[in-house]
């Protein structure tokens, strides 16, 4: 399972001219997370990804004595907008056309994607999503910009 995680000031996803998920503009902002599910990913992979995303220390904070520190979405109650994106699994190492062979088929990927979203919610995070498999327009106002890649190998339980 792969994720592109972007710290944003605001973000939204639109399907058929309707906003289906968003992160409102705020001082804290949130995380726009694009997730690709790989063949072989399991609920354990989804759980490991959710734990990593929830505790990834990429927000600015400060200690009680005012020293700067990095804090997680959990620490600052930052909302997430999580969007499925099978193209993250594209392999461009050969030729000019991406291969999608590493991407899980939709029937396999959707329950794993949903499990990751539920794991995030179970940790107390506010999570909006796009519509799995739909054509979506995603808009964001990046903060920083600050974007990281998270890769949890299939079956990883760490």
Swiss-Prot record:
Keywords: Cytoplasm, Hydrolase, RNA-binding, tRNA-binding. A motif (Gly-cisPro motif, important for rejection of L-amino acids) lies at residues 144-145. One of its GO terms (cellular component) is cytoplasm. It is found in: Cytoplasm. Gene3D superfamilies: D-tyrosyl-tRNA(Tyr) deacylase. It comes from the Bacteria. It holds the Pfam family Tyr_Deacylase. Homodimer. An aminoacyl-tRNA editing enzyme that deacylates mischarged D-aminoacyl-tRNAs. Also deacylates mischarged glycyl-tRNA(Ala), protecting cells against glycine mischarging by AlaRS. Acts via tRNA-based rather than protein-based catalysis; rejects L-amino acids rather than detecting D-amino acids in the active site. By recycling D-aminoacyl-tRNA to D-amino acids and free tRNA molecules, this enzyme counteracts the toxicity associated with the formation of D-aminoacyl-tRNA entities in vivo and helps enforce protein L-homochirality. Belongs to the DTD family. This is D-aminoacyl-tRNA deacylase. It comes from Corynebacterium kroppenstedtii (strain DSM 44385 / JCM 11950 / CIP 105744 / CCUG 35717). The gene is dtd.
């Amino acid at each position: 399972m792969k994720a592109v995680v972007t710290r944003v000031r605001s973000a939204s996803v639109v399907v058929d001219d309707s906003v289906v998920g968003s992160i409102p503009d705020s001082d804290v902002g949130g995380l726009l997370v694009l997730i690709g599910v790989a063949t072989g990913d399991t609920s354990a992979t989804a759980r490991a990804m959710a734990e990593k995303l929830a505790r990834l220390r990429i927000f600015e904070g400060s200690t009680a004595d005012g020293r700067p520190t990095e804090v997680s979405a959990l620490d600052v109650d930052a909302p997430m907008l999580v969007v499925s994106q099978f193209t993250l699994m594209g392999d461009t190492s050969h030729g000019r056309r991406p291969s999608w062979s590493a991407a899980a088929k939709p029937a396999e990927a959707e329950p794993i994607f949903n499990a990751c979203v539920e794991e995030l919610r179970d940790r107390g995070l506010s999570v909006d999503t796009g519509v799995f498999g739909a054509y979506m327009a995603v808009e964001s106002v990046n903060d920083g910009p600050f974007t990281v890649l998270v890769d949890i190998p299939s079956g990883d339980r760490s």
